[in-house]
């Protein structure tokens, strides 16, 4: 009988016995109770939670910073737009007394006198050309009568009884008002009609 043919108890070859014993050894592992948790696993879980919280805070900070940046950019653009739009306001305010003087000169001029006709015509043309120039830059005159009083563009200085004009409407304009690109730079001084 050769060694290969040699059988161990119960007819098993020696290699089969070793493999079987090895399987038994692997099957026997120390049992870990639920109470025995590896402290490293606990620390890893804690660190992962801290990392997730830090990422969440960082994301919120970044979103807030982006929103602040967008708001600042939008405000700056609006400020620049307003600066361009209303840059002429100071200049126009300086021109208003000149325009008022030309208006008053026309009001008091004796238009019936033929000797003054060329001067009156010159004042009218000067006033017209000045108003045309300021209109090109967004200046509008507020001088309408028989319109409802608007506190945004009118300043009432007197109330007068009138049958021709409805109560609460502008009866007469004492001093013209002006707007620049829709913004009042000087309110019109007006008298307002009141009921009898």
UniProtKB/Swiss-Prot annotation:
Give GO MF terms, alphabetically: adenyl-nucleotide exchange factor activity; protein homodimerization activity; protein-folding chaperone binding; unfolded protein binding
InterPro entries given for it? GrpE, GrpE_coiled_coil, GrpE_head
One annotated GO biological process = protein folding
Annotated region (Disordered) at 1-41
Which keywords belong to this entry? Chaperone, Cytoplasm, Stress response
Question: Where is this protein found?
Answer: Cytoplasm
What PROSITE patterns does UniProt report for this protein, alphabetically?
A: GRPE
Q: Coiled-coil stretches, from where to where? A: none
This protein's major location comes to: cytoplasm
Q: Which Pfam families match?
A: GrpE
Recorded hits in CDD domains, A to Z, give: GrpE
Q: Name one GO cellular component term.
A: cytosol
Q: Which Gene3D superfamilies match?
A: 3.90.20.20, Head domain of nucleotide exchange factor GrpE
Positions of disulphide bridges: none
The superkingdom listed in its UniProt entry is: Bacteria
Q: Which family does it belong to?
A: Belongs to the GrpE family.
Assembly information from the UniProt record: Homodimer.
Question: What's the stated role of this polypeptide?
Answer: Participates actively in the response to hyperosmotic and heat shock by preventing the aggregation of stress-denatured proteins, in association with DnaK and GrpE. It is the nucleotide exchange factor for DnaK and may function as a thermosensor. Unfolded proteins bind initially to DnaJ; upon interaction with the DnaJ-bound protein, DnaK hydrolyzes its bound ATP, resulting in the formation of a stable complex. GrpE releases ADP from DnaK; ATP binding to DnaK triggers the release of the substrate protein, thus completing the reaction cycle.
Which protein is depicted?
Answer: Protein GrpE
Q: Which organism is it from?
A: Klebsiella pneumoniae (strain 342)
